[in-house]
């Protein structure tokens, strides 16, 4: 009893809610006084009485659900990489253990949920919003750093199209209008922060940083950021004729599904390569030239400006020439104008919960009061995928609020390739790979 009591007290101190200390009375009664039958479903057998196998299984299942749920909430949880936006650092089909204690676990904001599900079960929402808690994060080992892999709740996932749940509702509205979007993909669902889909990206800018992207490379506060080994940029690879051997490309670590080759072009118009891959491709005898694909202007300029945050034509940014952009930090105050409002309107209205409106004469009102400035209530981050030309990231939907941060990938415990059959679909070399 003493060991479990000490662990329980330490957990209560970490949680910071001392009402839970009353739980010590439950532990004491369960182990010592036995006044209340806390495990009411568990039958007590007389000597020689035959055990009920079904009740024993029920007891084991209930215990397992409680323990695993507790571990998932406060310590670590399993996730799967759904897309190629992080290749060649994290691969589609990687199954990860994500550490909640790295940055500190969030106290559940939506506690009524079906165990071992995130937001959907049998096509229906797997949670109830009857109880909603305010955002609170427990102490972690450290804060998010530049260059960290981060798992977070998708900020634009607050509103979801029932027919196309993986699509970005807000992007649809910007491109096609709200009425058409709802008619085509609706009805819509509104999800609380902790029940929005999980994304994993690399943090490239912290609260208070100024970020720029020049020639596809990231700069923070005027200094060029480290080009991490897994970062891929797109290149046009011209060959002397024909394809490059697929085995050669696979050995380089390329995802063949991302390579376009139709025989009418002398090579590959868009090949995602890390610096190491770039050096190797340049040595292939059939390769004539390798040139970076950089968007000075988007292909459908100027309409495509609407696809890049802050979704205004006067920004003039592309995915390879982006910013400078200041990342909001808690307690900082900015002057508000109609020109810079697109940068902060979702922060004010969606993430920090204020009523925001503008008038025809150019005035800005927050919670019914005219406002010329705004003080941020949370920290914000800027996330980008390592596969820089095949990643929907903060360049396309903006800042990631601190209350959306879930944890840090710690280890790949399984990795599978959906394009192959067992056992060739197992990436054995990635088993138990530390991230």
Give the role of each language-model region.
Residues 1-435:
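Extended hydrophobic leader/signal-anchor segments used for secretion and membrane insertion
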């Amino acid at each position: 009893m003493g060991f479990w009591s000490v662990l329980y007290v330490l957990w209560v101190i970490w949680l910071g809610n001392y009402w839970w200390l009353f739980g010590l009375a439950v532990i004491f009664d369960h182990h010592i006084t036995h006044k209340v039958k806390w495990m009411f479903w568990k039958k007590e057998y007389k000597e020689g009485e035959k055990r009920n196998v079904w009740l024993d299984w029920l007891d084991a299942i209930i215990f397992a659900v409680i323990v695993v749920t507790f571990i998932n909430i406060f310590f670590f949880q399993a996730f799967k990489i759904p897309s190629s936006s992080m290749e060649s650092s994290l691969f589609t089909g990687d199954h990860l253990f994500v550490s909640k204690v790295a940055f500190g676990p969030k106290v559940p904001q939506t506690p009524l949920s079906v165990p071992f599900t995130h937001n959907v079960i049998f096509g229906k929402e797997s949670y109830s919003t009857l109880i909603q808690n305010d955002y609170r994060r427990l102490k972690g080992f450290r804060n998010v750093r530049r260059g960290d892999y981060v798992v977070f709740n998708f900020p634009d996932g607050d509103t979801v199209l029932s027919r196309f749940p993986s699509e970005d509702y807000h992007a649809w509205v910007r491109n096609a209008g709200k009425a058409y979007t709802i008619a085509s993909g609706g009805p819509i669902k509104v999800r609380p922060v902790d029940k929005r889909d999980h994304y994993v990206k690399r943090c490239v800018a912290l609260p208070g940083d100024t970020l720029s992207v020049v020639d596809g490379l990231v700069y923070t506060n005027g200094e060029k950021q480290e080009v991490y080994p897994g970062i891929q940029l797109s290149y046009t690879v011209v060959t002397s004729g024909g394809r490059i051997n697929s085995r050669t490309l696979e050995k380089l670590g390329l995802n063949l599904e991302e390579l376009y080759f139709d025989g009418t072009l002398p090579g590959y118009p868009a090949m995602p390569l890390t610096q190491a891959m770039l050096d190797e491709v340049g040595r292939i005898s059939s390769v004539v030239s390798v040139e970076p694909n950089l968007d000075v202007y988007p292909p459908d300029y100027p309409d495509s400006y609407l696809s890049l945050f802050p979704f205004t034509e006067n920004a003039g940014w592309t995915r390879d020439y982006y910013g400078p952009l200041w990342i909001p930090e808690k307690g900082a105050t900015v002057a508000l104008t109609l020109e810079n409002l697109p940068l902060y309107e979702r922060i004010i209205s969606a993430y920090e919960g204020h009523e925001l409106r503008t008038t025809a004469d150019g005035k800005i009102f927050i919670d019914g009061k005219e406002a010329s400035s705004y003080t941020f209530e949370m920290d914000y981050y800027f996330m980008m995928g390592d596969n820089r030309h095949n990643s929907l990231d903060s360049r396309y939907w903006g800042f990631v609020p601190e209350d959306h941060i879930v944890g840090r990938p710690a280890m790949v415990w399984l990795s599978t390739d959906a394009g192959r059959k067992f056992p060739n679909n197992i990436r054995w070399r990635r088993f138990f790979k530390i991230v």
